[in-house]
């Protein structure tokens, strides 16, 4: 990456940052989100998830996790399943992003599933690690392809839950061949 940026005339101005070296912080933030009520342990088995996906496919619907464990009080925790940690996405209203390229963008919160932020092995997903690391490095601008717009809506909800300042987002249209 560094050499590719140099080829473009963009000089590297700091230490290289390796995301996997910050896992302890990512896990700590996931645990804090649980304590604040913005995340939860999900004990769905792979079989359950696959059944849900197949059901959605048969109905011609995109898969969205059914939130079974979101507010679980009476469910028995399976002893043979390690949980993933899911972020509690907002259910109502809209999430709004002021994009520097595309202007104000919004999405209905009902279309954002409760996404996984920590896998069963406690490794963070992109949504959590990118958000935490950008915050830790005081990133002010996130510039990426517009295929990542949905990620920005999810990450904005994490920023809001943690009370962190949201960086400026700029989503650039991708170059597509004919």
List each model region and its residues.
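Glycine-rich loop at the start of a catalytic domain that most often binds anionic cofactors/ligands
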Residues: 2-5, 28-32, 54-56
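A glycine-rich helix N-cap at a beta->alpha junction
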Residues: 2-20
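Active-site cores that bind ATP or allylic diphosphates and position pyrophosphate for catalysis
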Residues: 18-19, 35-178
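Glycine-rich nucleotide/cofactor/substrate-binding loop typically near the N-terminus or early
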Residues: 15-17, 23-32, 46
